[in-house]
Amino acid sequence: GARYSFQVAKVDNGRCDPVAGTNTGESLPLASIFKLYVLHALAGAVQHNTVSWDDLLTVTAKSKAVGSSGLELPVGARVSVRTAAEKMIATSDNMATDLLIERLGTRAIEEALASAGHHDPASMTPFPTMYELFSVGWGKPDLRDQWKHATQQVRAQILRQTNSTPYQPDPTRAHTPASNYGAEWYGSAEDICRVHAALRADAVGPASPVRQIMSAVPGIQLDRSVWPYIGAKAGGLPGDLTFSWYAVDKTGQPWVVSFQLNWPRDHGPTVTGWMLQVARQVFALIAPQ
């Protein structure tokens, strides 16, 4: 059967105060919501002056292998950190994500899990790049079973192995969930609220563009006179569908609303529209009168 979580929380002074929810402590697939941890790590690097928004990243064959949804660039082309971050959030660009992880280093993402309040950073250590996770989940050879039963050390070896071979998607598994084998990025509804709150706190000084990056695509139609700011990140992989919003109402009260759904087989396309209707109803319930 399906597993799911849902949470509505107020954010006060950077802390999440749950108002309603189900299974809010359960670790479930994040799909592309994991990219919020990459953005949080990037914001920290920008604050500490180790990375600048204007730094250029060079497109590699490996980063292109995971697909791009907005940066149709050839190998060797260069893209700024700022543009990569914008695309990673707005169009969930996988190539941009891996270029940023490569620039920051996976250690920085693992540290970001901790500083953003993830309940179990060890569960995402070693932190897989998209190339690595796609290789484990959907590539040849099939490494899913190996991954499922592997210790942290063995998982690190598996990730090294995927990096030494070209990613070849296995068409027979293209639509089968890898989350059944633990090949996903994981977090709870509580974690999702905390990383949204962390990103809001990040968005000051040199890292202030984070606020605009998060809100470029609201991902939901709400009355903007009631909800003047809507930051959003959603995700979808076979069997996994996730939504999250950091929205500020007209009184200035921030809210985080999230949904995570997980099925043992691929879900159809209709469920997305249905979930967005549910989300709109939730926002209607919490909107100031």
Report each predicted region and the residues it spans:
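Short charge-dense sequence patches
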Residues: Y37, L56-G67, G139-H149, L159-Y167, ...
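Active-site-adjacent loops and short helices of periplasmic peptidoglycan-processing enzymes
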Residues: G1-P128, L133
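Mid-domain, small-residue-enriched loop/turn segments at the edges of structured enzyme/sensor domains
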Residues: R3-Y4, T91, T97-H196
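General structural signal for secondary-structure boundaries
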Residues: D54-L56, T60, S80-V81, P126-M130, ...
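Acidic-enriched, low-complexity/disordered segments with a strong bias for Aspartate over Glutamate
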Residues: D12, D17, D54-D55, D93, ...
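Structured C-terminal helix/loop/strand segments within mature extracytoplasmic catalytic/sensor domains
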Residues: D170-Q289
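Low-complexity, flexible helical/coil segments
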Residues: A41-Q47, M95, M124-P126, S135-G137, ...
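Charged, low-complexity, helix/coiled-coil-prone segments
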Residues: G25-I33, A41-T58, Y131-D142, Q153-I158, ...
